[in-house]
Amino acid sequence: MGNTSIAPENVLNTKKKLPRLGFLGVGWIGRNRMEVIAKSGLAKVAVICDTSPEILQQALVVAPQAKTVNSYDDLLSAGIDGVIIATPSAQHAEQSVRALKSGLPVFCQKPLGRTANETRRVVEAARKADQLLAIDLAYRFTAALQAVHRVISSGLLGDVYAANLVFHNAYGPDKEWFYDRARSGGGCVMDLGIHLIDAALWMLGFPPVLKVNSKLYTQGRHLNGQSNSVEDYATAQVETASGAVINLTCSWRISVGQDCIISSEFFGTRGGASFHNVNGSFYDFVAERYEGTKRIPLISGPDDWPGRAGLEWLERLQMNERFDVRNDELVRVAEVLDAIYHSASTL
């Protein structure tokens, strides 16, 4: 949740005991985050838990010294100092609450909950336990999006009154649970739109949201609240108390002529700024500032950002940080997600 500078050598020089971490769910994303943490030298990959023996074996290639366990109970009682959760979305809230009530800090994949109520329950558990909680809103930690945030925060754009954010994924998830509303909480809005909502509200300073209008589609057909299908295309307009309007569009499996389109544009009374991917890449981004017809580069080039959110959480864990009041922002994002689904269901 913010800028970060990781300096492993400085941390190691303090000769503090490295945190022992437990990893619940080590599929592709969980294993990637585990590998980043293992390579950082900032913590020990102590315990791994997954329902798939094959996936466990793949994870042991990354962390051969780790202990494997068969249940979450065993992981929580293994003498660890924090939990990394990367399981299907429906399990996030309950698993996070259990860890927090056990006195363990939590880093969880998004979404923290399928609804605002689930998300609020986790945040309140963290508050009551006074434990560190964060989720993997990874795009906040790209150098390009942070550059745009600095420009907006500086006031260089004047009053920002409009934002357009897009995330089109030409492929979509490969795991079947993403398409089960009960297990995922929703489709592309829950998977991709959460990043757009978080980025927009973060840039604008989390103003209160006054009104949300949305339309959802599945395979080109309008989707309403009576369907059990999840959306693969969504568009929404969010009006805020600051006067700014936010336009969001996201999709899975859409023909966009490239792997993906990821972009955020912000327009103010004195200029604009943008964050966008390069040549359809999921990983490479640039940031620019606009002055009339002039484009001014802010940042470009290689940026090893995947996993950076977890490292920021880990750095704060090593500093013995406790509950972060900014966790309330997670509830604000979840409330907008709820409003998008509610608006679409009333059409």
Residue ranges, per PLM feature:
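Beta-loop-alpha module in the N-terminal Rossmann-like domain of NAD(P)-dependent dehydrogenases
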Residues: 63-125
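C-terminal helix-rich "cap/oligomerization" subdomain common to oxidoreductases
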Residues: 1-15, 74, 82-85, 131, ...
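N-terminal Rossmann-like dinucleotide-binding module
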Residues: 2-63
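Hydrophobic residues in well-ordered beta-strands that form the structural core
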Residues: 85, 108, 133-135, 248, ...
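Contiguous beta-strand/loop segments that form the cofactor/metal-binding neighborhood of enzyme cores
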Residues: 2-7, 198-280, 310-322
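Active-site loop of classical SDR/Rossmann-like NAD(P)-dependent oxidoreductases
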Residues: 51-54, 275, 299-311
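Rossmann-fold dehydrogenase core element
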Residues: 119-139, 158-165
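Predominantly a Rossmann-like dinucleotide-binding segment in NAD(P)-dependent oxidoreductases
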Residues: 139-227, 347
